[in-house]
């Protein structure tokens, strides 16, 4: 893909948009960045862009700016129904995303992981396993560095391990990972995609360019993910907690096993008891990583050692502290209902659950069966609070806390020794926080302010 002298517009100046703009400029393109945010809001990044000869359009998108380009690169946070994109698409102007741009230049082998939940943990674990096998590994995508920022350091003999979201997949065309993983597909981001069917279609783009030379790893226990097999040209491998798999990774008699082919011998990998991560969903994440790593040629011994040493990723069912016999867990990354369900299922009972944030057109009623005998009370926060309380009315005691600060204080004060205070919001964070990371950090700060106390001490009014 020749970029020198081409007029390229980058739409959206988030982390990936900024990285894409700088990459394009280094490759000789005439780059413009367009963002709906004001120049004041973008003041941190504008000077560096101008210094590199990149033009900046702030405070809105101009249709003429879009029409003057040879190529448009869309950041994942920008909806494809943005009016200016809809208009220029009619003229046949190429529109791709940052991941697709990177895929045209990335060297070496690619392992790409998507799913509604578990992406970050599985991606991080796969990276750790490949590093344990002394491979040259870069990890990025929807976590850490944008994919485009990995290009310059990529090597023909190396691996790029990528977490890829549905937003990123929407704008892919030739993105072809040698190994692709779909962990699960449950309703999420319906406010963006419009329907579950559209969301599934976006997820399935991860294997759209694959051939029979490539591998696709699917969750045999997840209906939507497993149905993807019928639409794939790839070699299919499976993972399952619940059944023996002919080709892939599975659990049998308390051990994780792997079978490379239907007629191959079964290889023992490690006992479930040696997985350091909490929750059945993390067994699935480990199974997916085991399958991917064996297909990448990593030995069972290296996989076992890496899994044993792996620790929970921040904001993902992260243990924060025990205060007065009460355990506090931060699962701020549980930004949808299915993720919250898996967090709740990780504990046998005694849960004081903090739910809420910005609604994503979710159905919280699916949590009702989990409440009896497991959740002592729900503390609602954010703009979704009223909807959550309506959906869970009568299933569990409900406390309208409003803010995370008050929710933590109320839950900490009500919990008894042996109980758990769990932040698993089932919502995005953007109504009260910059992102889920900030929400999780605030939760941890609120909890740790009480560390060392014999019992929870509520803040004074």
Swiss-Prot record:
Gene Ontology MF: a single term: UDP-N-acetylmuramoylalanine-D-glutamate ligase activity
Q: Where in the cell is it found?
A: Cytoplasm
- Does the keyword Glycosyltransferase feature in the UniProt annotation? no
GO cellular component entries: cytoplasm
Q: Which residues bind ATP?
A: 115-121
Q: What is its EC number?
A: 6.3.2.9
Task: State the Pfam families in the record.
Answer: Mur_ligase_C, Mur_ligase_M, MurD-like_N
The reaction(s) catalysed by this protein are: UDP-N-acetyl-alpha-D-muramoyl-L-alanine + D-glutamate + ATP = UDP-N-acetyl-alpha-D-muramoyl-L-alanyl-D-glutamate + ADP + phosphate + H(+)
Q: Which Gene3D superfamilies match?
A: Mur ligase, C-terminal domain, Mur-like, catalytic domain, NAD(P)-binding Rossmann-like Domain
What the entry lists under NCBIfam families is as follows: murD
User: Entry's HAMAP family?
Assistant: MurD
**What is the protein's known function?**
Cell wall formation. Catalyzes the addition of glutamate to the nucleotide precursor UDP-N-acetylmuramoyl-L-alanine (UMA).
Q: What is this protein called?
A: UDP-N-acetylmuramoylalanine--D-glutamate ligase
Task: Give the originating organism.
Answer: Acidobacterium capsulatum (strain ATCC 51196 / DSM 11244 / BCRC 80197 / JCM 7670 / NBRC 15755 / NCIMB 13165 / 161)
């Amino acid at each position: 893909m020749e970029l020198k002298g081409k007029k390229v517009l980058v739409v959206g100046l988030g982390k990936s948009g900024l990285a894409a703009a700088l990459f394009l400029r280094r490759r000789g393109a005439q780059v413009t960045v367009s963002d709906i945010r004001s120049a004041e809001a973008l003041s941190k990044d504008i000077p560096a862009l101008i210094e590199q000869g990149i033009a900046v359009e702030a405070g809105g998108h101009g249709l003429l700016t879009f029409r003057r380009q040879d190529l448009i690169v869309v950041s994942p946070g920008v909806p494809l129904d943005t009016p200016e994109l809809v208009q220029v698409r009619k003229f046949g102007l190429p529109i791709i995303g940052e991941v697709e741009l990177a895929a045209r230049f990335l060297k070496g082998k690619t392992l790409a992981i998507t799913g509604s939940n578990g992406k970050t943990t599985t991606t991080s674990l796969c990276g750790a396993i490949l590093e344990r096998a002394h491979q040259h590994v870069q990890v990025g995508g929807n976590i850490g560095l944008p994919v485009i920022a990995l290009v310059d350091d990529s090597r023909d003999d190396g691996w790029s391990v990528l977490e890829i979201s549905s937003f990123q997949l929407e704008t892919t065309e030739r993105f072809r990972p040698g190994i692709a993983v779909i962990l699960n597909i449950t309703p999420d981001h319906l406010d963006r995609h419009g329907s579950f069917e559209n969301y599934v279609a976006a997820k399935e783009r991860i294997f759209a360019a694959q051939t029979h030379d490539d591998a696709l790893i699917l969750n045999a226990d997840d209906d939507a993910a497993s149905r993807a097999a019928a639409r794939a040209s790839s070699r299919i491998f499976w993972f399952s907690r619940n059944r023996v798999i002919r080709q892939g990774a599975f659990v049998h008699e308390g051990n994780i096993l792997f079978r490379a082919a239907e007629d191959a011998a079964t290889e023992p990998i490690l006992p479930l008891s040696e997985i350091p991560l909490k929750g059945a969903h993390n067994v699935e994440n480990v199974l997916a990583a085991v399958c991917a790593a064996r297909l990448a040629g990593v030995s069972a011994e290296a996989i076992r050692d890496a899994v044993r040493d792996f620790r929970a990723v921040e904001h993902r069912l992260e243990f924060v502290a025990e205060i007065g016999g009460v355990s506090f867990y931060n699962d701020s990354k549980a930004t949808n209902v299915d993720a919250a369900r898996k967090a709740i299922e990780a504990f046998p009972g005694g849960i004081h659950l903090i739910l809420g944030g910005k609604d994503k057109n979710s159905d919280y009623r699916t949590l009702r069966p989990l409440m009896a005998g497991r959740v002592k009370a729900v503390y609602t926060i954010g703009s979704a609070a009223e909807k959550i309380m309506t959906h869970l009315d009568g299933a569990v005691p409900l406390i309208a806390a409003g803010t995370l600060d008050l929710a933590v204080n109320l839950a900490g004060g009500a919990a008894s020794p042996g109980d758990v205070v769990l932040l698993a919001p089932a919502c995005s964070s953007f109504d009260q926080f910059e992102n889920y990371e900030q929400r999780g950090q605030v939760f941890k700060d609120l909890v740790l302010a009480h560390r060392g106390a014999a019992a929870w001490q509520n803040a004074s009014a």
